[in-house]
Amino acid sequence: MSKGHSLQDPYLNALRKERIPVSIFLVNGIKLQGQIESFDQFVILLKNTVSQMVYKHAISTVVPARNVRLPQQNPAGEGESED
């Protein structure tokens, strides 16, 4: 798994499993709301009254309705910023 996915996948998976409502802002400013039904490397399925397939390259920001707790995966400090 590439380093770029080491945070993205667990974060999206937590949103999906806990059925946390999200607001997704697209790069063109449009705001979509719903729950993450599924996702893969390129798209997110967002469910509200209908299911929408949203391409990840079009997403600017994902804002959950409440805090998300991610499972601890590397207690040795891996995953922290490398400044």
Curated annotation (Swiss-Prot):
Name of the gene: hfq
S-S bridge residues: none
Function: RNA chaperone that binds small regulatory RNA (sRNAs) and mRNAs to facilitate mRNA translational regulation in response to envelope stress, environmental stress and changes in metabolite concentrations. Also binds with high specificity to tRNAs.
Keyword DNA-binding: no
Superkingdom classification of source: Bacteria
Family, as annotated: Belongs to the Hfq family.
Keyword Glycosyltransferase: no
Keyword terms: RNA-binding, Stress response
Subunit text: Homohexamer.
Residues of the signal peptide: none
Pfam families in the record: Hfq (PF17209)
A single BP term in Gene Ontology: regulation of DNA-templated transcription
Species the sequence originates in: Marinobacter nauticus (strain ATCC 700491 / DSM 11845 / VT8)
A single GO cellular-component term on record: cytosol
Listed name of the protein: RNA-binding protein Hfq
Family matches, as NCBIfam families: Hfq, PRK00395.1
